[in-house]
Amino acid sequence: MMSDYTWFEGIPFPAFWFSKEILENSCKKFVVKEDDLIILTYPKSGTNWLIEIVCLIQTKGDPKWIQSMPIWDRSPWIETGSGYDKLTKMEGPRLMTSHLPMHLFSKSLFSSKAKVIYLIRNPRDVLVSAYFFWSKIALEKKPDSLGTYVEWFLKGNVAYGSWFEHIRGWLSMREWDNFLVLYYEDMKKDTMGSIKKICDFLGKKLEPDELNLVLKYSSFQVVKENNMSNYSLMEKELILTGFTFMRKGTTNDWKNHFTVAQAEAFDKVFQEKMAGFPPGMFPWE
């Protein structure tokens, strides 16, 4: 069992998937092209749901692509070896995904017209989702309790480092025309509105019936049951009994798991780390 991290420039990555050589390539040699579309998230923020929506927008709601090709081939991960190789060989407009923090991302992005969609989720729900995810998969250090994981998370001692630094870094681009910020909570509350917002950002005009197909085939239950999207094809030796890649897909599940003391400790760190953002910036506040 690979239970430790590959550390790269101060950020921990799950050792099974990441070597320093792969990360060197992804962060320093990868060249972003003008017509690229990049989906960026911190882990466990709704990444697969967003990929599914974007794929369906590109096919105007036709589900054939999402039902026939694994999600990691439709939108390869820049920072994995296989994803990096696929992307460097890919012709035409590329769709890609990354969890990389801003300071590690290829500098070629910042002088390009490539479009970026950055999805943010309430970090308390991210934490709970990550706790259940990592406890069932053989890729990372296992916390002995949720309390331990809260401590790790608040210190940034988890895969891809600090949520707070990740968000602060990427949100510095929020005024750029080619950078769209979405919130998981807003997407859950008004999925169709979010689909239309993504269409506008991408310059895609979909008819009402096509928008309805995007909505239908990107629903949590449909994505959870799609073997091309739910990671059921993942190698069995990585998965422990009881694993499900997509667990609940809800908001505010953290309230079912945090103690009062944990909630207070989290709030204190959140206020300190996210000071300076305008009031009402985050929909869960």
From Swiss-Prot:
3'-phosphoadenylyl sulfate binds at residues 44-49, 121, 129, 184, 218, 247-249. It is found in: Cytoplasm. GO terms for molecular function: alcohol sulfotransferase activity. It is an enzyme of class 2 (transferase). InterPro entries: P-loop_NTPase, Sulfotransferase_dom. Pfam families: Sulfotransfer_1 (PF00685). PANTHER family: SULFOTRANSFERASE SULT. Its EC number is 2.8.2.2. The lineage of its organism: Eukaryota, Metazoa, Chordata, Craniata, Vertebrata. GO terms for biological process: steroid metabolic process; sulfation. The active site is at 99 (proton acceptor). Induction: Induced by estrogens and suppressed by androgens. Expression is under the influence of pituitary growth hormone and thyroid hormone. It catalyses: an alcohol + 3'-phosphoadenylyl sulfate = an alkyl sulfate + adenosine 3',5'-bisphosphate + H(+). Disulfide bonds: none annotated. One of its GO terms (cellular component) is cytoplasm. Sulfotransferase that utilizes 3'-phospho-5'-adenylyl sulfate (PAPS) as sulfonate donor to catalyze the sulfate conjugation of a potential wide variety of acceptor molecules bearing a hydroxyl group. Sulfonation increases the water solubility of most compounds, and therefore their renal excretion, but it can also result in bioactivation to form active metabolites. Keywords: Cytoplasm, Lipid metabolism, Steroid metabolism, Transferase. Detected in liver. SUPFAM superfamilies: P-loop containing nucleoside triphosphate hydrolases. Belongs to the sulfotransferase 1 family. This is Sulfotransferase 2A2.
